[in-house]
Amino acid sequence: MSNSKDEVERIDWLEAELADTIDEDYELELSEPTLSEKIREIYRKAHPPALPRMDYFRALLALQAELIKLQDWVVYHKQKVVVIFEGRDAAGKGGVIKRITQRLNPRIVRTVALPAPSDREKTQWYFQRYVPHLPAGGEIVLFDRSWYNRCGVERVMGFATEEEVEQFFDDVPEFERMLVRSGVRLVKYWFSITDEEQQLRFLTRIHDPLKQWKLSPMDLQSRVRWEAYTKAKEETFARTNIREAPWHIVEANDKKRARLNCIDHLLKQIPYEDVPHEDITLPERIFNPNYERKVLPPELYVPAKY
């Protein structure tokens, strides 16, 4: 029956997921009933009960407060941190990165999402274009995809030869060991979603004009080559899961839980602690009795439309 308990739970989850789309940016008010109908037609997988919105926000804020402590510790002790986010298209990598960086200093914590290599970069040592983005002391770098493109999208889409992929598998463990020996704290995450969940998220992007930019021709090809990506992922884990930099898999079908679980886990990978801070005193403003404020022409001001 279409009104069975399972069907009701699926519909409830879908409505919560659409509401979460609005929550993500706090700016969007969108009512698109045909969107949920189109997605509901193809969506048949039950989800765990939705995490209550306020519970999610409270947990997220608490974790973000800890991230600020981590940032302060990294700066104080001149630590170097690299976090790699990998996973299938639409797995939620960008979403968790956004929540990590949301309340942090962009001069200290930065995101690297490199485009396809240029013709010049294709002639370089493979890791060369990533090296300039590695952190100095007191910095955290988040890679939204990384050098693992070589054994993922480049391999599956035919942009790298099997010889180049084999060379990568030979080189990457030692490359990462070199980073760790140099003092870099390297953490690697793989965001895992099901075939059906990816389909839902792609369809949401297709029908949401504010998200269509996220959907590339390469994303569409990833649907056709799902099993090839699965094989590539399995070999990647088998050959690059080293003691110095192991992989951590985040179950990401539930975006909110995935964000919280990932941030909580990340905080546990680094032995940060509270660091001393100087007391801040706001100085009094100095008034100059002889200063006469100039009147600026009205055309300099942005119109007060709202």
UniProtKB/Swiss-Prot annotation:
The keyword Transferase belongs to this UniProt entry's keyword annotation: yes
EC number in record: 2.7.4.-
Pfam name, any one: PPK2
Biological processes, Gene Ontology terms: ATP biosynthetic process
This protein's UniProt keywords: ATP synthesis, Kinase, Plasmid, Transferase
InterPro entries associated with the record: P-loop_NTPase (IPR027417), Polyphosphate_phosphotransfera (IPR016898), PPK2-related (IPR022488), PPK2_PA0141 (IPR022486)
Catalytic activity: [phosphate](n) + ATP = [phosphate](n+1) + ADP; [phosphate](n) + GTP = [phosphate](n+1) + GDP
Residue stretches in coiled coil: none
A molecular-function term among this protein's GO annotations: polyphosphate kinase activity
Signal peptide: none
Family named by the database record: Belongs to the polyphosphate kinase 2 (PPK2) family. Class I subfamily.
Function of the molecule: Uses inorganic polyphosphate (polyP) as a donor to convert ADP to ATP. Can also convert GDP to GTP, with lower efficiency.
PANTHER family assigned to the protein according to its UniProt record, in alphabetical order: ADP-POLYPHOSPHATE PHOSPHOTRANSFERASE, POLYPHOSPHATE:AMP PHOSPHOTRANSFERASE-RELATED
Name under which the protein is recorded: ADP-polyphosphate phosphotransferase 2
